[in-house]
Amino acid sequence: MKPFFSIIVPCCDVAPYLRESLDSVVKQPFSNWECLLGVETSKDNTEEIAREYAAKDPRFKVFTGPRSGSCSASRNTGIDMATGEYIIFLDGDDTIVEGSLQRLHDKIAARPGADLYPCAVQVLDAKTGKITEVRDNYPADAKPEFTGPEATLFIAGIRKHPAPMMQLTVCRTAFLVEHKLKCIYGLRGQDRNFTPRALYFAKRVCPLHEPFYLYLNNRTGSVVTSIDKGVLLKDEAIIHQSLFEFHSLVSAKPSFDRRLTAIWGQSWISWIAYTWFSPMRIKRIPRARRVETLEILFKNGFTDFGPLLGGVSKSLRIAGKAMYLFARHPLLRIPVELFFRLYFLLSKIKSS
């Protein structure tokens, strides 16, 4: 029988957490699933644990690869291997809430065939052992179904910083394959690139409001906590440069909803401004590193970036042009940094 769910689990250096993660799958009363374990070269016995589960239960399948630095490669291979109707992305240090697969199945069966089923994630603080928040981009009273562009516009209207986590959404396998929705190899934070593209192509988005995923936050040694933010700048630059190119491609279509330019521009450019130029980042990340990575971001000059500025606020438009000047004109770098110190100070005063 074809699995209903394909659960894709990237595994690298997660031996202390992997048994709990896989047990949370095995113990689900709902049993029609396969679990694809993407094991990258690890410094611990992650692979041994993964193969132990595969030896005991044929629903677990192990594939291996070299150490890549992120979940992207394992997720991409998992999508290619998946035989289930729907895909769930689960990290090897996180768990699935008890009994939630059956609830997900029942809710999906009531509205079958959607491309994306956004759910909710419970955030567990690794240091305190307490659930600190539940992330759900859609309020309980949201309408039951959107198109992808409608969902993008709706979320932008109610959330300044929606959660882009891939784990938040159950995806129809055929939809991901049809639109070649993959992660960029080796990059951290790939959710930020995947989510807007998936929403753009989705014809049906059905929020389920099911808090099925338990996300372990602040874990020592995780990719998020163990890498200096200056190192992550290169990944952020590649991700956003890819998004700029994506916007240029799809915005040329006659059917493109021009409101998406404003939404994407506001979101992406404000994130870039904060990531490269907030006072804390200016202090902690060397100027040379910020210049180097902005050159990646603006590798096509103003061609892909400029059109996004048209729909953003006046202050953000000025900030966007300042970022470009910082990357291209060495003599303006100190003045631009001074501008951003004032920019973020005024933003803080305005929001207080």
Where are these regions (language model features)?
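Catalytic core of nucleotide-sugar-dependent glycosyltransferases
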Residues: 210-219, 225-254, 271-303
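Glycine-rich, basic loop-to-helix element that forms the pyrophosphate-binding segment
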Residues: 65-82
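Short, well-formed alpha-helical segments that are part of the catalytic scaffolds
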Residues: 13-27
